[in-house]
Amino acid sequence: MSHLVQLIDGQWLAGEGKPFESMDPAKNEVIWQGGAASASQVDAAVKAARAAFYHWSDLALEDRLAIVRRYADLLGEHKEALALTIARETGKPLWETRTEVAAMQGKIAISIRAHDERTGTVENPMPGAKAFVRHKPHGVVAVFGPYNFPGHLPNGHIVPALIAGNTVVFKPSELTPMVAEAMLKIWQEAGLPKGVLNLVQGEVETGKALAGNPDIDGLFFTGSSRTGHFLHQQFAGQPGKILALEMGGNNPLIVKDVSDVDGAVHAIVQSAFITSGQRCTCSRRLFVERGARGDALVKRLVEVVGQIKVGLYDAADQPFMGAMISEKAALGMVAAQANLQQLGGESLLTLKHLEAGTGFVSPGIIDVTAIGALPDEEYFGPLLQLIRYDDFDAAIDQGNATSFGLSAGLLGDNEADWQHFFKRIRAGIVNWNKPITGASSAAPFGGIGASGNHRASAYYAADYCAYPVASVEDSKAAMPDQLSPGLTF
């Protein structure tokens, strides 16, 4: 257990706010305890970041990159320990948390390349002078992290922000404070100067204090649509502050004319049930053609999903699904399923809470075709809604019938169908014959509508971590060859 859980100006401090704790959702054990950061501690963290800003941003880029690269090396050295920490706090299997740490490490080189390509210096010739486009850091930025990828996703904001020369105050999810603490200790080991990256742990009040601090220059958020909308309202009337929002989705996956049924079923499983359905890109709605071909695919899907192994993150025989983040989240999925059943949905595979006190659930599939007004909700767990369709265009229209717009996909053999689908579907990530949970860090990541505010992260994070500055320059002031009308010298 740790009591010094806030990192402010290079010092580990006890939180002055109310105590909170983190649970291992697979073993129902308290694994971390600490006090939340008070409003005054949040303010101190912002002040520390402000005090460190000029020193950090004035460093040569290569000097900043040397520390960031050292952090990447240390992630490799601490891979097993960090993977276990993530597994204990999230319930995800070790095979998956190891891939998360690897993604954190891989983010470094990608972020460096993106910074160079998207925010480098450009010189354009012009008569009698030189024109430049350069980029400058915003200053002090807040980063809010989620619980589903407590290392990788905040890392995707923090790394490009630091490369650009910003200083950061990081507020992780209150459900994964132990992972955040481990990350910050690795940054310290890498030699990051004090005040450049500060950590404020806590629940809602800590987050409100940070988001509402008048001295931050921006906020980068990954999390629920509800919280993102609250932040958007809080930032209203403050155009001088940049707000980058990455939120959830009610993501459609359409199946049409597939010849390899098992290949399609595998893509569906990876789209809907990986990470126990706790990825923002997970498929929530599956559209399958009516008729014998669709019936065969649904039958095979139910067979395969019914055999998915659910178990402890550290089991010798690794499961595909671990626990959800908490018992509360697990019970929320049971309640969501019951609501859909009450509206007319028919469970083909019932999601069940497997063990009291834990986040373990079995995966579920529910046919919601008969529900006339399907709720536009993101059910953040392993519950897949099945919709049978007759007309491809109608399926696309229904897929678009959501306030969200994060990910979407088509499973089908016809390229003309794919081209049509790509043109019509509204989402920021659109895949063909691949799981819609699959995304490349070398591409932008984000959505439209209630899924984000057009501030795509991943490769495009460099865009919101620095602002462009246009300059026209000459080595000295000089009279022009010809004066403007009405001027006399």
From Swiss-Prot:
Pathway: Amino-acid degradation; L-arginine degradation via AST pathway; L-glutamate and succinate from L-arginine: step 4/5. InterPro entries: Ald_DH/histidinol_DH (IPR016161), Ald_DH_C (IPR016163), Ald_DH_CS_CYS (IPR016160), Ald_DH_CS_GLU (IPR029510), Ald_DH_N (IPR016162), Aldehyde_DH_dom (IPR015590), Aldehyde_DH_Superfamily (IPR050740), SuccinylGlu_semiald_DH_AstD (IPR017649). Keywords: Arginine metabolism, NAD, Oxidoreductase. The active site is at E246, C280. CDD domains: ALDH_SGSD_AstD. It catalyses: N-succinyl-L-glutamate 5-semialdehyde + NAD(+) + H2O = N-succinyl-L-glutamate + NADH + 2 H(+). Gene3D superfamilies: Aldehyde Dehydrogenase, Chain A, domain 1, Aldehyde Dehydrogenase, Chain A, domain 2. SUPFAM superfamilies: ALDH-like (SSF53720). The keyword Transferase does not apply. Pfam families: Aldedh. One of its GO terms (molecular function) is succinylglutamate-semialdehyde dehydrogenase activity. NAD(+) binds at G223, S224, S225, R226, T227, G228. One of its GO terms (biological process) is arginine catabolic process to succinate. Its EC number is 1.2.1.71. The keyword NAD applies. Catalyzes the NAD-dependent reduction of succinylglutamate semialdehyde into succinylglutamate. PANTHER family: SUCCINATE-SEMIALDEHYDE DEHYDROGENASE, MITOCHONDRIAL. Belongs to the aldehyde dehydrogenase family. AstD subfamily. This is N-succinylglutamate 5-semialdehyde dehydrogenase. The gene is astD.
